[in-house]
Regions:
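Conserved beta-strand/loop scaffold segments within soluble protein domains that form the structured core
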Residues: 106-115, 121-395, 409, 413-447
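N-terminal amphipathic, basic helical "cap/leader" segment at the start of enzyme domains
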Residues: 1-146, 315, 321
């Protein structure tokens, strides 16, 4: 309760400052979100979806917050070049929880496409933002989402109009920077109109060696016949705590490709809630996790088949070394009347040491009788016979271990449809297994 009380006291004492620096449409839901948090609090391990990670411990330390929206000095040209060779991107920066618009090269986007500050657009067009903001990210169902909603002051809006295809990948670099331990609360709102197509690459980095706590809520609306590719890559450091809740709503015949990659972190908790609202939609959800030392990565997913004739595919793979701890809980819910549903959920895990720990819980909950659904999970160690075979042919034990780990994780990397990113991940993962990569390789401030 101590950790909850400090956030309740914070809002009661600082709500005027928070609202002063935010658009009215964002403020309109704050008080209700605050009351939801007062009622729900931080989810305990008794809550099924949070049984593997102690959320109160993550939020208990005393972090600073930039409620007065003081400008954080950055040099985007020197610091934040998160390069993916051979991938042409439109580059945007979010520093802590604020959209950064200064001294960036002008980005040419198709007519009508918007990538801008959520707070800015909310002030300019409150009717549009009010139609979507905090609608599928329900504060009365999750304490973390409620906390983010009453504290968040800015973030990112991405809007793609009807039948517009964005050819270049939109790359968003989320940078954590501070001279003191800091908490940031970031919002992302993605609206894809009917027939729209776009690819997004979100890269999370920590530029300073401080204790960071980042909460993030992403709401994505994918219209009829629209296509959304979302790649989320985390390369922070061991002092970083990240809690990300992603909510996706799909209409008829839409397609979503959601990929979450964790290469460096401290404690990471990713939640994905995806709901099918129209028939003929499909989603592909992939997760790639590499963790060692005392790192923790917890992925929790819910795929909600509310209508029939939809397809979902999930593949999450973990490689855990040292005393790392991983968790995966994936629930596929097929509701009454959701006939002709097809679903495959797979979680495969490799513990490279005896001290690494993995918790896995794939779940199917089916209330329709004409479906094709399967799920499975495995947890194992390196194959001693394969190691021996390779050593007999002159391969050192360490090199053999690396090759087997790389072959194991390769399956999920190869499902990434962005070929340049796929090639980049092969390079980063190999260096990670060799112990040559301690944090982000591409950003100068991260060195």
């Amino acid at each position: 309760m101590l950790s909850e009380k400090q956030y309740l006291d914070l809002y009661q004492s600082s709500s005027r400052v928070i609202k002063k620096n935010s658009a009215e449409v964002l403020n309109a839901v704050r008080d209700a979100a605050f009351e939801d948090f007062r009622r729900l609090g931080f989810p305990s391990r008794k809550v099924e979806r949070y049984k593997y990670t102690d959320m109160s411990a993550i939020f208990e330390p005393d972090y600073g917050l930039n409620l007065n929206r003081l400008e954080i000095p950055v040099d985007p040209y020197e610091a934040f070049r998160c390069d993916v060779p051979n991938l042409s991107t439109s580059l945007y920066l979010v520093v802590n929880d604020a959209f950064y618009c200064k001294a960036l090269p002008k980005v040419e986007l198709p007519e009508g496409v918007i990538v801008d500050s959520l707070n800015k657009i909310a002030a300019e067009n409150p009717e549009f933002i009010g139609k979507y903001y905090a609608k599928i990210a329900k504060t009365d169902e999750d304490g973390i989402t409620a906390l983010n909603t009453f504290l968040a002051q800015d973030g990112l809006l991405i809007y793609v109009p009807k039948n517009v295809k964005v050819e270049r990948t939109i790359q968003v670099i989320n940078i954590l920077r501070s001279d003191v331990d800091l908490m940031v609360n970031r919002r992302v709102l993605i609206v894809m109109e009917q027939g729209a197509e776009a690819k997004f690459l979100f890269c999370d980095h920590a530029a300073d060696d401080k204790n960071f706590l980042a909460t993030q809520v992403i709401e994505a609306y994918v219209g009829e016949n629209a296509s959304l590719d979302l790649y989320c890559l985390e390369e922070t450091h061991y002092k970083n705590r990240r809690v990300s809740n992603v909510y996706i709503e799909q209409q008829a015949n839409s397609r979503v490709n959601h990929n979450v990659i964790t290469l460096h972190n401290g404690i990471t908790r990713n939640r994905l809630d995806l709901v099918f609202k129209g028939e003929g939609a499909e989603c592909f959800c992939n997760g790639c996790v590499i963790a060692d030392k005392n790192q923790v990565v917890d992925n929790n997913t819910l795929i909600d088949h509310q209508v029939g004739h939809c397809t979902s595919n999930e593949l999450y793979k973990y490689v855990l070394d040292g005393e790392a701890r991983g968790a995966f809980a994936g629930r596929v819910l097929v509701r009454h009347g959701a006939q002709k549903t097809t679903s495959q959920e797979t979680n495969q895990n490799l513990c490279a040491t005896k001290t690494a720990r993995m918790f896995t819980q794939p779940m199917l909950e089916i209330y329709a009788d004409d479906v094709k659904c399967a799920h499975g999970s495995t947890v194992g160690q390196l194959n001693d016979a394969a190691l021996f075979y390779m050593q007999q042919r002159g391969v050192s034990r360490e090199e053999a271990k690396l090759l087997l780990q790389f072959a194991f994780i390769n399956e999920v990397i190869d499902k990434m449809e962005l070929e340049p990113l796929r090639d980049r991940l092969h390079h980063l993962v190999e260096k990670r297994f060799r112990g040559e990569l301690n944090k982000c390789e591409g950003c100068k401030l991260c060195k």
